[in-house]
Amino acid sequence: MTLPRSSRSVAVDGAQPYTITIAPGLLADGARLARHVRGRHALLLSDSQVAPHYAAGVRAALLSARPDLQIGELVIAAGEASKTLDTFGSAITALAELGATRDACVFALGGGVVGDLAGFAAACWMRGVDCVQLPTSLLAMVDSSVGGKTAVDIPQGKNLVGAFHPPRAVLADTDTLRTLPARELRAGLAEVIKYGAIRDPLFFQWLHAERHALLDSDPAALAQAIARSCEHKAEIVARDPLEKGERALLNLGHTFGHAIETEQGYGAPGNDNLNHGEAVAVGMVLAARLSATLGMSNAQDTEALRALLHDFELPTDIPPGLPPEALLARMRLDKKNIAGRLRLVLWRGIGKAEVVPDVEEAAVLKILAG
């Protein structure tokens, strides 16, 4: 199958280079899927929302190109609540029961939770097998499927147990966005906005101009947003694959956002808790407000960010019932911290993020208290 003219590809350079392909119809392209399976075993990991739409088609596409494949399947409950060590254990068991050898491949068919679990299982099985990311949510296409960060949550915090394991390929089939709930689309757009906020003022302006098209799931607008976001992440990941420096900038809003998610208990789909993208949206506003309080930026840029997020129908305030002290306690467990001191991604205005070490907790607590 040749790619349509609307397709785009982004190369991720580094010690383990790979390509992000963005196009409609990729999940039906058996030859393209199967070329990434070096051996005879493949595990297809998906969730209860995505699998009914796409799992059978992906399996059929793989077998049409590689009838010799032995394909195992694991379907987990949808939502962040499944990103646990127990579910990770289920993935490892599935690989064992499949008889997967070191040339096996794990296909991650779903959003960020599926991608994290599949990637972590692939990283650990026999000390590392291939993983192909098949993101079906906008958030996964522009963020979690790219870069090789894999992890699960524990009660004490989000993404505290994991590994760096770059995928063999990322195949982002934009047709899957047709079945994406509106709330999940908006969650992904929060991560898209982040790229404009941290390093691309022109992209920030473009997002404002195209906000109605993006919210209406216009294919051309979404393809452009995905490609530009992936280009930004690919550039950063290539220079800093293990997050020793610049890559931390991709976490604007995440320290605050992860604290909110953890304190709310990683709610299941359909409840009132914030999802990841929504929590990041709130976190970005909090980071911008803290930056202004510290004299790093101005109130106008903070308001521009808040207004853009609001225009995309995203939350910008901490949900009620979350004590500031409890959120601060969660933030103390963030992986970016050093020697027990808060280390946050803040900004000097639109397009100019930076990592700030040793942020005073009193200033953070004041922002959390509103």
Curated annotation (Swiss-Prot):
SUPFAM superfamilies: Dehydroquinate synthase-like. Its cofactor is Co(2+); Zn(2+); NAD(+). It is found in: Cytoplasm. Its EC number is 4.2.3.4. GO terms for cellular component: cytoplasm. Coiled coil: none annotated. The keyword Amino-acid biosynthesis applies. Zn(2+) binds at residues 191, 254, 276. GO terms for biological process: amino acid biosynthetic process; aromatic amino acid family biosynthetic process; chorismate biosynthetic process. Binds 1 divalent metal cation per subunit. Can use either Co(2+) or Zn(2+). NAD(+) binds at residues 112-116, 136-137, 149, 158, 176-179. Pathway: Metabolic intermediate biosynthesis; chorismate biosynthesis; chorismate from D-erythrose 4-phosphate and phosphoenolpyruvate: step 2/7. It catalyses: 7-phospho-2-dehydro-3-deoxy-D-arabino-heptonate = 3-dehydroquinate + phosphate. Keywords: Amino-acid biosynthesis, Aromatic amino acid biosynthesis, Cobalt, Cytoplasm, Lyase, Metal-binding, NAD, Nucleotide-binding, Zinc. GO terms for molecular function: 3-dehydroquinate synthase activity; metal ion binding; nucleotide binding. Catalyzes the conversion of 3-deoxy-D-arabino-heptulosonate 7-phosphate (DAHP) to dehydroquinate (DHQ). Belongs to the sugar phosphate cyclases superfamily. Dehydroquinate synthase family. This is 3-dehydroquinate synthase.
